[in-house]
C-alpha cells in the first residue's frame, strides 16, 4: 500500500465500503482534516487512487491478469476471505436503458487455503493427496531497543512463530515452491525455504534408513526429494526481516 500511495497524485478514502459516504481526498502536501460523518452502523473503508502521471506514461494501464493473480493469491492465503475483482474500464451500456451489457468480474474464495493453492499451482497428475504440515514454536531474538537514556541497547525479545505448509508430488519433474511470510510473497525464498528443504531431506533420509530401498552405497540428495514436488510454504511471525521493498 505504501508504494501505491507514493506513486499516486490523489488518494480517496471514503468512510464506507459500499454506498455513499464522506470522501477524504489526499494529495501531496495536503493535511488530515475532518470531512464528514458516516451513518450509524455503517462500517468499512473503500480506497481509491489515481496514478501520478509524472511517474506513469499517459497510456499506462493496469494489468487485469496481474491484479487477478494477486487477488487470487491473497484469497488462497486467507481461507474464507472472498475477493471480488471487477474491470469497469471497457463497460458497454445500453444506450436506451443505461443497463450494463458486458463487464469482466471474478469472485475468489478458497476455504481450503493453501491446500487448494498447491493443487492450483500443480501442472502434472498427482501421485499423492496434498499433505498439510503445521506447527508453532517460539524463539528468542536479540534486537536493539531504546533505553531510558535515549540510547540503543541489545535486548532479548521472545517471538512466536507459526508454520503452515501444503505439498504434493506429481508425475512431472519440475519443482514449484511458493513461499510467504505474513502472506507477503518471498519470490527468492529465504531461510524459511532453506529450512523446509533441509527438513524434508532429513525426513526422507531417516525414513529410508534401515530399509532395502536404497543400497548401502547410495544416499538420497535434495534433488531426489524435490523432483515433481509442488509446495506452498507460509510463515507467520512478528517483525520479519526482509531485504528491500521487494520482500526478498
Task: Tell where the protein language model's regions lie, with residue ranges.
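Ser/Thr-centric signal marking residues that sit
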Residues: 43-45, 186, 191, 246
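Core catalytic DNA strand-manipulation module of type IA topoisomerases
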Residues: 32-35, 220, 245
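GHKL/Bergerat-fold ATPase module in large chromosome/replication-associated machines
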Residues: 86-241
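Short, polar/flexible loop-turn hinges at active-site or ligand-entry regions and domain interfaces
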Residues: 53-63, 187, 214-215, 243
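Short, low-complexity, polybasic intrinsically disordered segments
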Residues: 240-248
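Short, non-transmembrane amphipathic alpha-helical segments
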Residues: 66-70, 200, 248
Amino acid at each position: 500500500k505504501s508504494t501505491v500511495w507514493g506513486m499516486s497524485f490523489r488518494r480517496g478514502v471514503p468512510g464506507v465500503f459500499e454506498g455513499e459516504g464522506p470522501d477524504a481526498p489526499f494529495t501531496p502536501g495536503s493535511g488530515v482534516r475532518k470531512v464528514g460523518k458516516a451513518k450509524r452502523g455503517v462500517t468499512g473503508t473503500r480506497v481509491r487512487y489515481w496514478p501520478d502521471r509524472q511517474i506513469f506514461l499517459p497510456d499506462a494501464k493496469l494489468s487485469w491478469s496481474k491484479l487477478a493473480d494477486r487477488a487470487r493469491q491473497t484469497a488462497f492465503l486467507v481461507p474464507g476471505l472472498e475477493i471480488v475483482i471487477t474491470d469497469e474500464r471497457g463497460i458497454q451500456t445500453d444506450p436506451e436503458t443505461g443497463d450494463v451489457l458486458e463487464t469482466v468480474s471474478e469472485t475468489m474464495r478458497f476455504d481450503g487455503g493453501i491446500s487448494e493453492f498447491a493443487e492450483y499451482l500443480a501442472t502434472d497428475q498427482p501421485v499423492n493427496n496434498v499433505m498439510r504440515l503445521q506447527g508453532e514454536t517460539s524463539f528468542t531474538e536479540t534486537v536493539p531497543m531504546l533505553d531510558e537514556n535515549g540510547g540503543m541497547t541489545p535486548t532479548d525479545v521472545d517471538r512466536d512463530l507459526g508454520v503452515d505448509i501444503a505439498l504434493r508430488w506429481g508425475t512431472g519433474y519440475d519443482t514449484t515452491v511458493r513461499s510467504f511470510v505474513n502472506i507477503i510473497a518471498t519470490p527468492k525464498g529465504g531461510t524459511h525455504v532453506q529450512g523446509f528443504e533441509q527438513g524434508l531431506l532429513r525426513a526422507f533420509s531417516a525414513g529410508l534408513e534401515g530399509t532395502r530401498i536404497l543400497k548401502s552405497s547410495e544416499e538420497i540428495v535434495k534433488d531426489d526429494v524435490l523432483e515433481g514436488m509442488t509446495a506452498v510454504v507460509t510463515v507467520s511471525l512478528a517483525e520479519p526481516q526482509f531485504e528491500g521493498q521487494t520482500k526478498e
